[in-house]
Amino acid sequence: MDANTFIPEHFIDDVKTYLPAHLDIDDFINACRRPLRKSIRVNTLKISVTEFKQYAKQKNWLLTPIPWCEEGFWLERPAAEEQNLALGNTDLHLSGAMYVQEASSMLPPIALKQSIEHTNYVLDMASAPGSKTSQLAALMNNQGVLVANELSSSRLKVLSATLKRMGVGNCALSHFDGVIFGNYMFECFDSILLDAPCSGEGTVRKDADALKNWSIDSNIEIAQVQKDLIKSAFYALKPGGTLVYSTCTLTPLENQHVCDFLLSEFGDCIIPESLSDLFPGASKATTPEGYLHVWPQTFDSEGFFIAKFKKQASSDNPNLKVKKGAFPFQQFESKKSAVFMQTLKQQFGLNTLPGILMQRDKELWLFPQEFEAVQNKIKYARLGIQLGAIHNNGVRLAHEFATAFGKQCKSNVLPLTDTQANDYFQGKDIRLADVSQNTGEVILTLCGCPIGLGKWQKNKVKNSLPRDLVQNTQLITWAQSN
């Protein structure tokens, strides 16, 4: 138990007013004081669950399946490793093979899974730091268009870095207050996830001070923001589309009441869809409305709320707006495209790229195939994947090319040892045991996952890792420092 976890009495008094009858307040308080179990999600854009399990077994990691996410596991590591090597510094994390993600936060994308597997346009309205965005991209198998929005500039940078590491290629990043989507992107999306900003009452097991500034007045203020966002989400959703609303808080003010607002605002145009059968055992957390209200003691996780809706019919939006300004990209010339693709085939055995080659100044980008329909709706902070920089003698490939498409490359691919990978992430060149006759660029892999680019130079590979990604700490294995 963590005696330092701050749980104010007036918060407990409030919880007592809406705690379900079958749950006990003492169990709730005790659960809030227990350390949160570590959990991870396998990134199937880079590695299969079966392959990941094999690597985990070699490390003596104990994986316990999370019942609602087949890619998710609670994780226990050997004590020595746990004490000496941060989970974020392990090879499976650095390679993008996994994401450290709280178990209950995997639920909102799973609630959208059936919808997004058959749709082209998905919006993640409040995306950072990227756990759910990368999960959505994996469920979409990098197909279609995923618009990921984040209001905070600093969090947007974190989101961008996460998506690069995870090999996400179908994403467009935007930097707005989510309330603009209903006006500028009216009925553009087949599926929308609104994981709304909230009071975070369910996160106290991760953050002992999460409730330090808690008040009902604050709940009420946040709920108004959530209502504005969910109204915008409704307008941005196509008729027949699916909306999932979620928070990591417990109070009905930010959960059921926000859903009630949506239903009263749009009447028969939108209906709730029950999540009681989302996974075996979901009924333990199902509300009378069919929402999921996950309490910390229900599944020994963070607290979470998830609701799912189907848009039945359109409703007029009187505030439609149109973006001004020209689109800064143009399609890459067909002759140059052919030369570029031939180069990729010769160097890496890569025959195709899944998208449209676009140019902005001297930058070469790859956009999702279906992006044209929404490209002029808003100004995007970042689109697709930057493949490289255009020079007179061709294209100098970018780091992102490797992390996104290295898995499909068949030649000039170099698996790194732990020592070599440690050197790579620390910005050092990679020493080779023998002189290589290969020339040009090479895809570097770790745990079977592409992690970046290098350049063959006889008895070494020159490091091409961007400077902002270089890490000056012990990585991969703690035993080296003993």
From Swiss-Prot:
GO terms for cellular component: cytoplasm. GO terms for biological process: rRNA base methylation. Its EC number is 2.1.1.178. Specifically methylates the cytosine at position 1407 (m5C1407) of 16S rRNA. It catalyses: cytidine(1407) in 16S rRNA + S-adenosyl-L-methionine = 5-methylcytidine(1407) in 16S rRNA + S-adenosyl-L-homocysteine + H(+). GO terms for molecular function: RNA binding; rRNA (cytosine-C5-)-methyltransferase activity. This is Ribosomal RNA small subunit methyltransferase F. Its main location: cytoplasm. It is found in: Cytoplasm. Belongs to the class I-like SAM-binding methyltransferase superfamily. RsmB/NOP family. The active site is at residue 248. It comes from Pseudoalteromonas translucida (strain TAC 125). Pfam families: Methyltr_RsmB-F (PF01189), Methyltr_RsmF_N (PF17125), Methyltranf_PUA (PF13636), YebU_pre-PUA_dom (PF21150). InterPro entries: Methyltr_RsmF_N, MeTrfase_RsmB-F_NOP2_cat, MeTrfase_RsmB-F_NOP2_dom, Nol1_Nop2_Fmu_2, Nop2p, RCMT, rRNA_ssu_MeTfrase_F, SAM-dependent_MTases_sf. Disulfide bonds: none annotated. Keywords: Cytoplasm, Methyltransferase, RNA-binding, rRNA processing, S-adenosyl-L-methionine, Transferase. S-adenosyl-L-methionine binds at residues 126-132, 150, 177, 195. It is an enzyme of class 2 (transferase). It comes from the Bacteria.
